[in-house]
């Protein structure tokens, strides 16, 4: 049996998502979308709702853009490793809906973080000009990547297969999935609180996607549901 054909037949959504994300990445490179202030990012990355660059469709389009090859590679690797199995269990339609809900939840969480930072600037210790300057900086921030949706998949995997042993580099011994996922989420929470946007990682988007993924599978299991619809 042809291996590539087997993958397409068993995980069509995962396969197509990887293809689409890869094609979008090549399009980004071709049209200058790797630059933070590029027109491509203005149009399709997720901006704060008060930004002049914000468009509602960015809640979806940002999920298909990436900031570099390594960013794309890690997200697609996680999608392939964990998403393929979840798609086989749930079926393509259910998996696709799950994926987009987690991605949208990640966008909402990141938007909430932007809003908190925007309104949290202390006007009592800054001049009006300085406060306006820092608020303008926040309005220029933009989020891209499928990481929030991938974190939702990881959370679902950790809930569904909590005792599966995972090898995570550079840790030299296996870790149960439930502890690995909890550890990753905890690092994102800490990273978001400690660093805000200074490391260019949308930590709260990751957390939002993970929480959405966990709540969805928790609801399914409690209600013994087989569909969203």
Locate each region found by the language model.
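A detector for small-residue-rich transmembrane helices and their helix-helix packing motifs
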Residues: 1-229
